[in-house]
Amino acid sequence: MTKQELRQYAKTKRKEIVNKHEKDLQITKNVLNNPLVLKSKNILVYLSTPFEVDTFELISKLKNKNIYAPRIEKQEINFYKLDLNNLKMNKYHILEPLGTDKITNFQDTVILVPGLLFDQTGNRLGYGGGYYDKFLRNKSLFKIGVCYQELLIPRLEVEEHDIKMDMIITEEIWNLQD
């Protein structure tokens, strides 16, 4: 399948997920219990849309962490300190922070990355904009892909610009990559 066909397959599959809320809660629990998340100071987290793994429950439970969310600026994303009372909807119908406190020091930082599909070695199929791949290039932060178990497949074809995750967390597993 082409990347576009895989994206369509994943979008359809996401809509068919049974017990989504329970799976979201288990993924939240798995993220919160992850040793790297526990010891990190900064968490970069996407603001979920209806068919993605819900991050709002997770955000409400992340205590004593600096939480940042992405905002699209020109053709890239940057992460700004999250204030859930100060958000706007962007052209893709995704909530974004309006604040001005942008993270520039990525020491002690974990990023939770959305995707349509992930494979068992940490490869990710995104939405096609390349925003996360561009952002993650040349940054040393720990990358965690979050997805439902149904969207974790054995193998994805990747291109040179695709950035691999360090770990994948689903409702069933969290798996550190080699």
Give a label for each model feature.
Residues G126-Y131:
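Charged helix-capping and loop-helix junction motifs
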Residues M1-F106:
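N-terminal active-site beta-alpha-beta segment that forms phosphate/nucleotide-binding
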Residues Y46-S48, V113-P114, G145-C147:
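Short beta-strand segments
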Residues M1-E5, T12, N64, L98-D101, ...:
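Surface-exposed, charge/polar-rich loops and edge strands
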